[in-house]
Regions:
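Catalytic loop of short-chain dehydrogenase/reductase
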Residues: 90, 133, 139-163, 168-177
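Catalytic Tyr-X3-Lys loop
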Residues: 82, 98-117, 139, 164, ...
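Short, small/polar-rich loop/turn modules that mediate ligand/substrate recognition or access, typified
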Residues: 176, 181, 237-239
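C-terminal substrate-recognition "lid" of short-chain dehydrogenase/reductases
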Residues: 215-244
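Active-site Tyr-X3-Lys motif and surrounding loop/helix of classical short-chain dehydrogenase/reductase
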Residues: 69-76, 95-99, 103-110, 206
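Alpha-helical segment proximal to the catalytic Tyr-Lys
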Residues: 125, 173-174, 235
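Conserved glycine-rich cofactor-binding loop
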Residues: 11-12
Length: 248
């Protein structure tokens, strides 16, 4: 197996779990991170300890220059990319829309939406048979928030993830005949650090009763869905939005 995978936002949570699982499946993994080098290197160390191949590359996915430099380095050090997980994302403190600043909105959309578009664009340039590539697979990490709306908390984040759903559907149709499958997962209430960064560290515990399965999910459970979508086992699956939300 000579599959080269880039996981953006791969230093923690769903991204880290995906990188670790994919490495166990035989992927050579590039762990992208924005600022937490120590966490990214820990993921790389764990992959290497298990006999896998991995490297950590810093890049702010909202910065086109940094994205171009990251992909150029992957080309040089690993070869042609065959798989991408667009996982990098941020959420802010709970607020109503009428309280949100332009600065907040720009940050949410720059990282969650523009970053995903930039990385998808560069991946397609390398994977597409139209560009001489071997084909490949892209999985975008959306959110159940894209259909729930997150009122009085994160409507901006929910809207950004709605854009990711449309990116998934449109791009899947655009490159389906060029050897590339594009899918998304929609995680629900998942026990990761993103809740603390959004000001609600106990959110999973407090909302678990709203989930039909009566619990939050784990990053590893989301990673299982992502890695399946990347794999040949999902060879006829594209344009899908896979719910990993416990039924909520």
């Amino acid at each position: 197996m000579d599959e080269i995978l880039l996981v953006t936002g791969g230093s923690r949570g769903i991204g880290a779990a995906t990188a670790l699982l994919a490495a166990r499946k035989g992927y050579r993994v590039v762990v992208n991170y924005a600022s937490n080098e120590a966490a990214a290197q820990e993921v790389v160390r764990a992959i290497r300890a298990g006999g896998g191949t991995a490297a950590a590359i810093q890049a702010d996915v909202a910065d086109e220059g940094q994205v171009l430099a990251m992909f150029a380095r992957i080309d040089q050090e690993f070869g042609r990319l065959t798989a991408l997980v667009n996982n990098a994302g941020v959420v802010d403190q709970p607020q109503r829309v009428d309280e949100m600043s332009l600065q907040r909105l720009k940050r949410i959309f720059d990282i969650n939406v523009i970053g995903s578009f930039l990385c998808a664009r560069e991946a397609v340039r390398r994977m597409s048979t139209r560009h001489g590539g071997p084909g490949g697979a892209i999985v975008n990490v959306s959110s159940a928030a894209s259909r729930l709306g997150s009122p009085a908390q994160y409507v901006d984040y929910a809207a950004a993830k709605g854009a990711i759903d449309v990116l998934t559907q449109g791009l899947a149709k655009e490159v389906g005949g060029e050897g590339i499958r594009v899918n998304a997962v929609r995680p629900g209430l998942i026990d990761t650090e993103i809740h603390a960064s959004g000001g609600l560290p106990d959110r999973v515990k407090e909302l678990a009763h709203l989930v039909p399965m009566q619990r939050g999910g784990s990053a590893e459970e989301v990673a299982q869905a992502i890695v399946w979508l990347l794999s040949p086992e999902a060879s006829y699956t594209t344009m899908s939005l896979v719910e990993v939300s416990g039924g909520r």
